[in-house]
């Protein structure tokens, strides 16, 4: 079952674009939770509709009561690359809000250079701490824009993703907008089975 993001957008408290990852974390952890991508009867969330959350059209019986059935019990603010690396190694991706923007063209190693800034949230989905490319830890960032960038890829990275260098990762994390989520009601933890040989 997929999650529906409209409730998170409704939690912003304003009708304009954008929000903070801190506000989103607070909603899924304290005042609401995660809504499911389905028809709730009084409101249909089976198909994404940005205006529902943006215009505060989700009734409280859904926005608060139904969402709280799938509340995130643990949220952690990540501020160091070591914390980000450890979270990813344990199967937790990060939601990172920052003003950092990156090139739409990856280099020969799948890395995107920092470019003009944008205020945006992106998922960090993997880490390469082998230090084989730039003698530093790299983080794999997945953007939500579909196949928006081009260039070589490495280690099976998905379309729309790019690796970032450690110095950029440190800068993004220093703003305090990076979060890891765990222990969600209704979604039991899954055992991760892998060996170091499967990673390389």
Spans of features found by a protein language model:
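Acidic helix-start/capping segments at beta-turn-to-alpha-helix junctions
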Residues: 1-11
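Predominantly the structural core of cysteine protease catalytic domains
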Residues: 9-142, 147, 151-200
